[in-house]
Amino acid sequence: QWGQHPNIPP
């Protein structure tokens, strides 16, 4: 559900 965040794992 991420991927769009630079600091959060995909």
From Swiss-Prot:
Protein name: Bradykinin-potentiating peptide S5,1
Function: This peptide both inhibits the activity of the angiotensin-converting enzyme (ACE) and enhances the action of bradykinin by inhibiting the peptidases that inactivate it. It acts as an indirect hypotensive agent.
Gene Ontology CC terms: extracellular region
Main location: secreted
Stated family: Belongs to the bradykinin-potentiating peptide family.
Tissue expression notes: Expressed by the venom gland.
Superkingdom of source: Eukaryota
Gene Ontology biological process terms from the UniProt entry: regulation of blood pressure
Residues that bear Pyrrolidone carboxylic acid: Q1
GO terms assigned for molecular function: peptidase inhibitor activity; toxin activity
Keywords: Hypotensive agent, Metalloenzyme inhibitor, Metalloprotease inhibitor, Protease inhibitor, Pyrrolidone carboxylic acid, Secreted, Toxin
Organism in which the protein naturally occurs: Bothrops insularis
Record localization: Secreted
